[in-house]
From Swiss-Prot:
Gene3D superfamilies: 3.30.1390.10. The gene is clpS1. Involved in the modulation of the specificity of the ClpAP-mediated ATP-dependent protein degradation. Disulfide bonds: none annotated. Belongs to the ClpS family. SUPFAM superfamilies: ClpS-like. This is ATP-dependent Clp protease adapter protein ClpS 1. GO terms for biological process: protein catabolic process; proteolysis. Binds to the N-terminal domain of the chaperone ClpA. PANTHER family: ATP-DEPENDENT CLP PROTEASE ADAPTER PROTEIN CLPS, ATP-DEPENDENT CLP PROTEASE ADAPTER PROTEIN CLPS1, CHLOROPLASTIC. Residues 1-33 are annotated as: Disordered. It comes from the Bacteria.
Length: 117
């Protein structure tokens, strides 16, 4: 909240148009905006999806370069799950849907999920 003192002009207020000697305070309130919740998009390991396909997914849908995609893919392979990125709800939901649809089109059982950070 911001408070600013304001001097009143002569004849603008008072008793019948005479000079006013008071001051008024005008307050402006800024609405508090809440940052949107963030969601992690995760790939889950399976025994059937080729590693090269996972790298392609990371490059295509998450704009990872070859090196970053390979590191994430190996993490998924070795640990069972890996983070592709952190996004707002709508973006994360869209990415999960895109990955799942693309994997199904290519007949791979790859799973992609999102969880609140």
């Amino acid at each position: 909240m911001i408070a600013m003192p304001v001097r009143m002009q002569q004849g603008s207020e008072g008793d019948g148009g005479g000079p006013s000697r008071g001051t008024s305070v005008i307050t402006r309130t800024k609405p508090k905006t809440k940052k949107p919740s963030l969601y992690r998009v995760l790939l889950l390991n399976d025994d059937y999806t080729p590693m090269e396909f996972v790298i392609h997914i990371l490059e295509r849908f998450f704009q990872k370069n070859r090196e970053e995609a390979t590191v994430i893919m190996l993490h998924v392979h070795n640990h069972g799950v890996g983070e592709c990125g952190v996004f707002t709800y709508e973006v994360a939901e869209t990415k999960v849907t895109q990955v799942m649809d693309f994997a199904r089109q290519h007949q791979h059982p790859l799973q992609c999920v999102m969880e609140k950070k």
